[in-house]
Amino acid sequence: MEPWGEPEEDISSGLWALPGLVDGHAHLAQGGVEIRPGDLDGAAALAKMALGAGVGLILDKGWRDLTVVHLIDKVPAAARPEIEAAGVVLTVESGFWEGFGRNVAPGDIGNMAAVAAGEGAGWIKLIGDWPRKGVGPVANFAEEELKEAVAAAREQEARVAVHTMAREVPSMAVRAGVDSIEHGLFLTDDDVEMLGARGGCWVPTVLQMEATIKQLGERSSGGRLLLEGVENVKARLATAVEAGVHVLTGTDLAIGTHQVASEAIRLWELGMAAPAVIEAVSWSGFRATGRPVGFDVGSPANAVLFSEDPVSNPRVLADPAAVIRMGRIVS
């Protein structure tokens, strides 16, 4: 199956180009909130749909199986975005959805992290905290355990992402040296300074947080906590960018990866400056993962083109004029 068409003329005249959009927190294994084993064919279709929407890089943050890792091998690179992926997520007993992910026994985090790093495609994912009935989100791992996981991942050149919605866990994870904070509702100024100093990532997934608030109800204890967290996110966005953090757009399960532009637009609506929004949905993801960016001779022939300057109007991100992958136009 050939998904490409050769350009008959120069389509770039009068258009604005980015190297591609980035989804920094995706779950391609399933197309929604159904917590089931992954669907390889469905994941391939979602990846193709994302490419058609201008997505050039996906950081998949894990599932209950290795569907997305297998996808990377199954689908030729020219027919999908670049993909890095965690494999099976790591948690503890009662620390995530029942039966989802691998439970880490006390004292075994280093071994489990090493296994996860070997199975994944560049990442491991830890569920840093999870709500317990009547208590709210509780830390699943001690800070020393997080440090062990980071050390084990480093030995295999893998990065570590940590899910966190609790108050204390973002600071623990940052001090432990993790590479990416997922959600991170309660990051502090000290956290973003430390994270930025090492070029770490933060993927706030605002649309997912707002969807969860709606599901829980704004007056519930969980809803109130997340509302407070989203307000903290708004207050930290500019500080994080200034500190050098790679703030990235991420869809999670709220929307599809092909809709990642909606997350960028939401960040803009929440007060993030337009240039920073464009960085978050494009350039920063490539830089954070060590990929070349730019359009100099010899650079990768990948681009998403827009009829308006996205810095002047971020809403145009949702309506690309053309997408180029490896020198060919996506049809």
Model-derived features with residue positions:
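Acidic/histidine-rich helix-loop elements
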Residues: 28-40, 93-104, 133-139, 214, ...
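His/Asp/Glu-enriched, well-ordered alpha-helical/loop segment
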Residues: 155, 230-309
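Short, acidic/polar
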Residues: 39-49, 101-117, 165-169
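Divalent metal-dependent hydrolysis catalytic cores, especially in the metallo-beta-lactamase
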Residues: 43-69, 80-91, 119-134, 159, ...
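Metal-associated gating/positioning segment near the N- to mid-region
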Residues: 15-77, 94-99
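Active-site core of metal-dependent hydrolases
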Residues: 133-234, 242-248, 253-255
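Active-site gating/metal-coordination segments in enzymes
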Residues: 94-147
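Histidine-rich, glycine-flanked metal-binding segment
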Residues: 1-19
